């Protein structure tokens, strides 16, 4: 699939679609709260399986959709090796960004409430650029935007679990667990709003390719070193 930034006659008609996708993708985080509504016999097994599934989805979308799309956009501007080099540079930057989030928001497994808060902050930092990418992708290419939104939705569910469960078991307060999970998910449409207000009018093939490769790096690191650790 290919993006066409220049042929943007129907761009405005895609704005509502893009906002809807990013909002649904973000609020899918709330599905991570659902286990608290049931008496699960093997909760740890469910969490592990959902994390593994989300990791597979994120890797698949990054490798099959985001990276090829980023390269195609770069190849329309730069021929041959420069396009590949730029893709790799911003892919690595995305990975480094995710690593820095882990470094400066350390995970303390001995304190459940702290774990839930740290998870929420880390996920908010992940969700804002994902919201930007979803909005900009969907507003120019609905298929790419839908693919990205689905992948984000799948990995947002176990991320919701990583917030809701520690918060609940540390406070015994389902309302608080729901609220913190909601705040995390709502950061995704906030990212879309940022994209619409400040970034959309400056977007072109080069900037879109940078964003896609950056998000691919971010998602690859999350998939391999956070969801599976």
Please provide the spans of the model-predicted regions:
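Intrinsically disordered, metal-sensing/regulatory segments
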Residues: 1-229
């Amino acid at each position: 699939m290919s993006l066409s930034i220049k042929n943007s006659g129907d761009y405005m008609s895609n704005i509502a679609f893009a906002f809807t996708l990013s909002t649904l993708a973000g609020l899918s985080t709330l599905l991570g709260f659902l286990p608290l509504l049931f008496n699960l016999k093997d909760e740890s097994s469910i969490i592990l399986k959902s994390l593994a599934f989300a990791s597979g989805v994120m890797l698949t979308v990054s490798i099959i959709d985001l990276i090829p799309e980023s390269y195609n956009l770069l190849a329309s501007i730069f021929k041959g090796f420069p396009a590949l080099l730029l893709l790799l540079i911003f892919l690595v930057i995305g990975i480094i960004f995710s690593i820095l989030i882990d470094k400066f928001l350390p995970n303390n497994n001995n304190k459940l409430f702290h774990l839930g808060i740290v998870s929420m902050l880390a996920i908010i930092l992940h969700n804002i650029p994902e919201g930007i990418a979803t909005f900009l992708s969907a507003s120019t290419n609905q298929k790419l935007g839908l693919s990205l939104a689905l992948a984000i939705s799948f990995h947002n569910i176990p991320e919701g679990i990583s917030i809701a469960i520690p918060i609940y078991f540390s406070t015994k307060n389902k309302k608080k667990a729901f609220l913190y999970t909601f705040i995390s998910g709502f950061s995704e449409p906030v990212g879309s709003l940022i994209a619409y207000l400040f970034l959309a009018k400056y977007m072109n093939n080069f900037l879109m390719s940078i964003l896609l490769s950056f998000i691919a790096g971010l998602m690859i690191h999350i998939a391999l070193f956070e969801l599976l650790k």
